Amino acid sequence: MPFRSNNPLTRDEFLSRFFPQFHPVTTFNRGLSGGSFLIEHQGQRFVVRQPHDPDAPQSAFLRQYRALSQLPACIAPKPHLYLRDWMVVDYLPGEVKTYLPDTNELAGLLYYLHQQPRFGWRITLLPLLELYWQQSDPARRTVGWLRMLKRLRKAREPRLLRLSPLHMDVHAGNLVHSASGLKLIDWEYAGDGDIALELAAVWVENTDQHRQLVNDYATRAKIYPAQLWRQVRRWFPWLLMLKAGWFEYRWRQTGDQQFIRLADDTWRQLLIKQ
């Protein structure tokens, strides 16, 4: 249920107004974007989320709520409340592991997601790449970064293979192994895009695992594996630039040294793949 409010609420104000009987249990810090916290009352649990990026428009947070509202509960948490700077969703019981599940199981989850109705907004990477360049630390902007950005701008994004709703942040920390199967959390980057973009963005351990995931997905989607892998590879430069730029952007926002280390590692990967 969406509520409108022009004045942001503190955590205590939010809980006392909307969940007076609930109390905070623990804070999650599973991803690089930030944390959420868990509230509980008589065994009922919800996850309270806030925007990870304080500079992002409110519409981005609202889109996450809308995406969750239309997704089936078998793959995503059900949302219960949306307010400016606050969202409450179901807590998904299960285990969050440090490694990806079997590639066939993960391919099945992604294929099922990609069969759902589209969200209604497109994922376009170039505006994000340019935003991260503009909002990064000027001392970190290099000639090589600008050259790669201009190259991608000229080349344009790969032509779509299949347009579907995407999660766009699939890694071990965002997968809940529940009694009823795999589920995805943290949908803040969700939107409509190429299925190969989703597959390219999965945080895999190595190329062999990546190829196997693509092959398993291709079998379900009735696509030639070699064709799908070629399309996935076309997205690699875009994804690496997206990751590097996002790490640079978050470094300037937070000053957290982990983002510098991750950015440097991603730039090295880009140089290797050129």
UniProtKB/Swiss-Prot annotation:
Tagged with keyword Kinase: yes
Pathway: Cofactor biosynthesis; thiamine diphosphate biosynthesis; thiamine phosphate from thiamine: step 1/1
EC category: transferase
Catalytic activity: thiamine + ATP = thiamine phosphate + ADP + H(+)
GO molecular function: ATP binding; thiamine kinase activity
A Pfam family recorded for this sequence: APH
E.C. numbers: 2.7.1.89
GO process annotations (BP): thiamine diphosphate biosynthetic process; thiamine metabolic process
Record's keyword terms, sorted: ATP-binding, Kinase, Nucleotide-binding, Transferase
InterPro entries referenced in this protein's UniProt entry, alphabetically: Aminoglycoside_PTrfase, Kinase-like_dom_sf, Thiamine_kinase
Similarity field: Belongs to the thiamine kinase family.
Job description of the protein: Catalyzes the ATP-dependent phosphorylation of thiamine to thiamine phosphate. Is involved in thiamine salvage.
Protein name, entry field: Thiamine kinase
Organism phylogeny: Bacteria, Pseudomonadati, Pseudomonadota, Gammaproteobacteria, Enterobacterales
